[in-house]
UniProtKB/Swiss-Prot annotation:
This is Gamma-secretase subunit PEN-2. Its main location: endoplasmic reticulum. GO terms for cellular component: endoplasmic reticulum; endoplasmic reticulum membrane; gamma-secretase complex; Golgi apparatus; Golgi cisterna membrane; membrane; plasma membrane; presynaptic membrane. Residues 1-17, 37-57 are cytoplasmic. It is found in: Endoplasmic reticulum membrane; Golgi apparatus, Golgi stack membrane; Cell membrane; Membrane.
Length: 101
């Protein structure tokens, strides 16, 4: 999609939809929102809706960073402690590795 062909009001509407969609446990939408609208929010000539778009881009970045931290922490903890959790660790695993922990 070429954002240059879309009206400023439509840009704001699209940015808002991606921002709200990220709350449905879809942090990838926040990443898309950041990439699509970063230049529009911070480098384009000023217009009425730009301050709202800037807010959505910042909040999308914070939400995406939060999810990256949470998922990285969980993956690290799970990889380190899964063998110690015994049956629970096996229950949470999709595949059970062979060998001894």
């Amino acid at each position: 999609m070429n954002l240059e062909r879309v009206s400023n009001e439509e840009k704001l509407n699209l940015c808002r939809k991606y921002y709200l969609g990220g709350f449905a446990f879809l942090p990838f939408l926040w990443l898309v929102n950041i990439f699509w609208f970063f230049k529009e929010a911070f480098f384009a000539p000023a217009y009425t809706e730009q301050s709202q778009i800037k807010g959505y881009v910042w909040r999308s970045a914070v939400g995406f960073l939060f999810w990256v931290i949470v998922l990285t922490t969980w993956i690290t903890i799970f990889q380190i402690y899964r063998p110690r959790w015994g049956a629970l660790g096996d229950y949470l695993s999709f595949t059970i590795p062979l060998g001894t922990p």
